[in-house]
Amino acid sequence: GKPTRQNCTFCHANAGGGDNVKHGDIAMALLDTTREFDVHMGTDGGNMECVDCHQVMRNVDGQLVDHGIGGMPYHSVDDGEMLGCIDCHGNVASIHVGTPVQTITELHPTLACQVCHIPAFARDTSTKTEWYWEDAGQDIDPIPVDPDTGRPTYDKKKGTFVWENDVRPTLLYFDGKWDRMMINKNDQYTELPVVLAKPTADYTTPGAMIYPFKKMIGNQPADAGNETMLVPHLFGTKGGPNPYWGKFDWGLALQDGADYTGQTYTGAFEFVDTVMYLTVNHEIAPKAQALGMDGACGDCHTGDQIDWIALGWSGDPVPNGTRP
C-alpha cells in the first residue's frame, strides 16, 4: 500500500534532532490531530496522507523511479511532484469571489495562499527558532528548561536554543529558486550574518509571489583564517577518530570534518552568526482563522507584524511606505 502519514512523519517531523525542531510546521502531532490544527490532515477534516500531495514518479510499468521530492540533501526540498493549492482549490481570484476577503485578494495579487491561511506555525509543538552551537561542551546541571514550552534550552552536545510556539512566519518573495551555501561550492562568506539559505527573488522578479518562511538564526563554527563555513564531525567513527560528541574538542572535530569533506582548514576557528529560511506549507488553519478574514487589514498592517523592508518597502505601505 501507499505510505501513511506515520511513515513520512517519523523522519520529517524529527529532522534536526527532535519533534518539530527544524521545519516548524511538521510535528508528530499531525499523526492524530484535528482540523483546528491542520485542515488537511485533521482526522475530523481532510484526513489526508502526505502522498496525496507529495506524489512520486513511476515508469510505464508502475515501478517507483523517484521519491518525487528533489533537493533531498539540502535544507528545504524542491517542489518535485508536489500538488499546489490551486490544483485542488482552483484559481485564487475566483475562489474568493463573494467571500469576506474578496477585496483583500483583489488588492494583493502576489500573496500566496499560505500567507493568509497559515497565520502562525508551531501551533501545537514548539520549534527551535534560535540555535547557538558556541555554547556546546559545558557541563550544566540542572539543565535549564523553557517555562512556556517545557523543553530544554541547553544540550551539551548542541548548545543553547530558543523554543517558540505560535510563530508568525517571515514573508519573502519566492519564485522557487534559492541561494544556498554548499560545501566546496560557495562556502565562503564576506559579511555577517552568514546567509545559509534564502530565496533569490524580490518584488521585481517576474512571477514571484509572497510566501511564508521560518527564519532560523544562530551561530556555528567557521574557519577564522579563510572565512569558510565548516562541517564538524559530530558522532561515529566513519568521519574520523575525533567526533565532537565524544571528545568535545571543536578543533579536532573540525579537522575531521575538513578531512572528510575535502575542505581546507587553517586550524583557526570562530563562531559566526548565521541565518536561514525554510518554507512553511503545513498547519493550514480553518478559514475563519485566516489573516484578513472579514476585512481585518490590521492582521498585517499598522503594526510590527511584517518586515516591510524585506518585501522592498521603506515601511508599511498603508500609512506611507514607498518603494524605489
Regions found by a protein language model. Give the residues of each.
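C-type cytochrome heme-c attachment and multiheme electron-transfer modules
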Residues: G1-P324
